[in-house]
Structure formats: structure tokens, C-alpha cells
UniProtKB/Swiss-Prot annotation:
Domain LIM zinc-binding: 5-56
Biased composition (Low complexity): 168-186
Domain SH3: 204-263
Protein name: LIM and SH3 domain protein 1
Main location: cytoplasm
Modified residues (N-acetylmethionine): 1
Length: 263
């Protein structure tokens, strides 16, 4: 069925049909409501679903309103409502905005370093909680505990040097009286000599590790090293700490296990 023209009411055939403003028009009937100038789809302007030319398009006029106390109150109330809504939207969206950062190797290295620092801090807090409060001594028990743990591993390294001094300057037959002389001079420390001798043998050929990060000593019983340094005579203390010697500097002490890798 062919529709009727919105202006003349006659049937509009497809060859002369204009579909605009939700209505159907003849091309000749699609003109300005005021001056009757024929319009097309490029130069018409619609107002209340009626076509107008640019010159006769109805202009919107504004009425001046006096600033009465009631109008001022309504204006202030509208501004307050807008401000409340703005704050409400701000609080809802607070903390949600974030920017996507590319996962580069540098960021991965920084993230891994931060995780390792957090692991070290957790280890320190664990040592503090294990010792418990100690009155007015403050942080002294923590330092003493770290020194005790390092001194527990140090005797194999400290008692190892005296052994080579006796080996090249004496024959095996002459070396037999040495443990007896130590026993006579120290008495109760007699068992320490054979234990030290047994542990000193594998100490020189201990495990070797390579540093994968730079580390600065946070305590006097720790050692500092740089990325690529070789750590020798390494001994495992626990899951988080090791004891060894930095081959480049010759310093011996505790070091974090997650800063090195086995060679």
C-alpha cells in the first residue's frame, strides 16, 4: 500500500516520495510552512515534525525571571544537590581508577626485589616474635640472637685456618701430640678439636653460589655483595638464610638465600 501525503493527503508513489520527520511527502509538498519554499533533505529544519527553511525556523526565546528570594533559594538548593551528587559519585569511583602498565622485564625485576625485601622483613619480624618482649633491653636480643646464629656456623670457618699451619711444618707422626696438648691447656674443650677437624675438611670444598641481585648488609653479621659475585663455602642455615664467603671481597657472614643461585 502506498502511503498518503502528510500535507495534501493524496497517495504518494515511490517516484515522488520523500520520507522525512516520520511522515511521507510529495516532493512538491515538502516546503517551508511559512514561505512555501520547496525544501530537500539537505536544507530543511524540522520543528514539531514540520519542515522549515533556515530563515523561518522558529527561534527559542527565553523569559527573564526576577531574582526573588524563592528563586534564589531554589537555585541554591539545586547547586547543593549537584554538589552532593558529585561527592557521592566521587566516593563511589574512588580507588577504582587505574592505568594499565606494561609488564616489562624491568618492572618484573623491581617486583621480584620488593617481594624479596618483604621476605627479609618478615624473617626479622619472625625472629623478634620468637624471642618475645625483653623489658628495657629493646632491640638488643634481636642482635644477640643473630650473632648467636652466625657464631653457631662460624667455628668451622674460624677454626679451619690453624689446621694448615701445623700440617706443612710437621710430620704426621709429630702431629699426634697436638690434640693432647690442646686437651691439657683447655681441659673441657677437648671434644671441640676433633669436631672442628671433621667439619673443616668439607668446608674448603663447600657449595658455590652466584649472586643474582645486589645486596647491602643490614646487620654486622651479614655480608654485602654485587650481582655476579661468587659465594663460596656456603652453608644452609634455614629456608631464608645462608652462611658463606664472598670470593671477591673475602667477607664472611650471613646472606639471604633468595639473592643467590647455585652454580
Amino acid at each position: 500500500m502506498n502511503p498518503n501525503c502528510a500535507r495534501c493527503g493524496k497517495i504518494v508513489y515511490p517516484t515522488e516520495k520523500v520520507n522525512c520527520l516520520d511522515k511521507f511527502w510529495h516532493k512538491a509538498c515538502f516546503h517551508c510552512e511559512t514561505c512555501k519554499m520547496t525544501l530537500n533533505m539537505k536544507n530543511y529544519k524540522g520543528y514539531e515534525k514540520k519542515p522549515y527553511c533556515n530563515a523561518h525556523y522558529p527561534k527559542q526565546s527565553f523569559t527573564m525571571v526576577a531574582d526573588t528570594p524563592e528563586n534564589l533559594r531554589l537555585k541554591q538548593q539545586s547547586e547543593l544537590q549537584s554538589q552532593v551528587r558529585y561527592k557521592e559519585e566521587f566516593e563511589k569511583n574512588k580507588g577504582r581508577g587505574f592505568s594499565v602498565v606494561a609488564d616489562t622485564p624491568e618492572l618484573q625485576r623491581i617486583k621480584k626485589t620488593q617481594d624479596q625485601i618483604s621476605n627479609i622483613k618478615y624473617h626479622e619480624e619472625f625472629e623478634k616474635s620468637r624471642m618475645g618482649p625483653s623489658g628495657g633491653e629493646g632491640a638488643e636480643p634481636e642482635r644477640r640472637d643473630s650473632q648467636d646464629s652466625s657464631n653457631y656456623r662460624r667455628p668451622p670457618e674460624q677454626q679451619q685456618p690453624p689446621q694448615p699451619h701445623h700440617i706443612p711444618t710437621s710430620t704426621p707422626a709429630y702431629q699426634q701430640p697436638q690434640p693432647q696438648q690442646v686437651a691439657q691447656s683447655y681441659g673441657y674443650k677437648e671434644p671441640a678439636a676433633p669436631v672442628s677437624t671433621q667439619r673443616g675438611a668439607p668446608g674448603g670444598g663447600g657449595k658455590r653460589y652466584r649472586a643474582v641481585f645486589d645486596y647491602s648488609a643490614a646487620d654486622e653479621d651479614e655480608v654485602s655483595f654485587q650481582d655476579g659475585d661468587t659465594i663460596v663455602n656456603v652453608q644452609q642455615i634455614d629456608d631464608g638464610w645462608m652462611y658463606g664467603t664472598v670470593e671477591r671481597t673475602g667477607d664472611t657472614g650471613m646472606l639471604p638465600a633468595n639473592y643467590v643461585e647455585a652454580i
